[in-house]
């Protein structure tokens, strides 16, 4: 074969390889962002863990140097270094057999809260979960509302779950979360906000809709924004309102139980009603996967709030494996995030319009809504 033909053939094969590689990359970045971001978050989390380990090692070395200096001088060194905030001694949980009266406010650290849970990811029908929960506690009422009767609930908490086509996940979430909240003696209600129509998934706008609908039912103290595929592993991860804004899902199994980055606010988070109104809720402009949690973090910081997180192993969650393709990537999120502060007063609870279809189910209130961009108009930014 002549040399110039061999060269053309190799060039063609090279171009074909580059085309295949680029189209595959675009598919994973745009159509299957969860796979790409899962590995990206793991790399970021590893970096944070390495920096934290180096910091702690440095503190330990410093302590040894200081102790040695005191020893040489023949004096005692009494100060104790605190290498990590998780080393601090927590308030103990109440002992078994502790009794409280119905007119007393429920304690926050009850003996019924056992700690690590046995997570069962096997699929189960929703009506089977309903039977199990009603058998365990008949006090669970329509709409997923419950309150304790052996003490006065300290907090009234609305759980908002954004939803589309995850019918196999809801029963698993309820099977674990409802009994945990009952053991925490919280008054709670579940709101599943289901997006209808063909627009890309808008998790943030669904949360805004859910907030407005939940506030029509009851004067809740706080709201928790809860992804349907996040299963808590420890019932001592208290869902009360006292330390909000709060990021609950600190350590997720698919990120190797590490925080992807310091500003990460996704999965499960919560704010008081007053805080959420003050920051104008979530942004409505994030269509598709990614960015809305980072924008919420920015809004919280702009308002001067400090986010708290559960210590140690309390913030562990497992993610239900997905058997279908996730939502498409929102490629415009970085542009919006750069203008978070300017957009905060324009885009959120105050510019949202919608027409919901509300139905009361046994374990939750379902809010079905068709979303479109003209439901939350905002000037060009």
Curated annotation (Swiss-Prot):
Residues the entry annotates as binding Mn(2+): 229, 322
Gene null: resulting phenotype: Morpholino knockdown results in dorsalized embryos which have ventrally expanded chordin expression and reduced activation of the Bmp-dependent transcription factors smad1/5/8. Proteoglycans exhibits defective glycosylation and a greatly reduced affinity for bmp2.
Glycosylation sites: 73, 82, 120, 366
Sequence ranges on the Cytoplasmic membrane side: 1-11
Gene Ontology biological process terms in this record: carbohydrate metabolic process; dorsal/ventral axis specification; ganglioside biosynthetic process via lactosylceramide; glycoprotein biosynthetic process; glycosylation; otolith development; positive regulation of BMP signaling pathway; protein glycosylation
Pathway assignment: Protein modification; protein glycosylation; Sphingolipid metabolism
Top-level EC class as recorded in UniProt: transferase
Residues annotated as binding N-acetyl-D-glucosamine: 291-294, 333
SUPFAM superfamilies membership: Nucleotide-diphospho-sugar transferases
Cofactor(s) the protein needs: Mn(2+)
Subcellular location field: Golgi apparatus, Golgi stack membrane; Golgi apparatus
Enzyme Commission number: 2.4.1.-, 2.4.1.274
Function: Catalyzes the synthesis of lactosylceramide (LacCer) via the transfer of galactose from UDP-galactose to glucosylceramide (GlcCer). Required for proper patterning of the dorsoventral axis during embryogenesis through the regulation of BMP signaling. Plays a role in proteoglycan glycosylation that is required for BMP-dependent specification of the dorsoventral axis.
Similarity section: Belongs to the glycosyltransferase 7 family.
Protein name, per record: Beta-1,4-galactosyltransferase 5
Gene coding for it: b4galt5
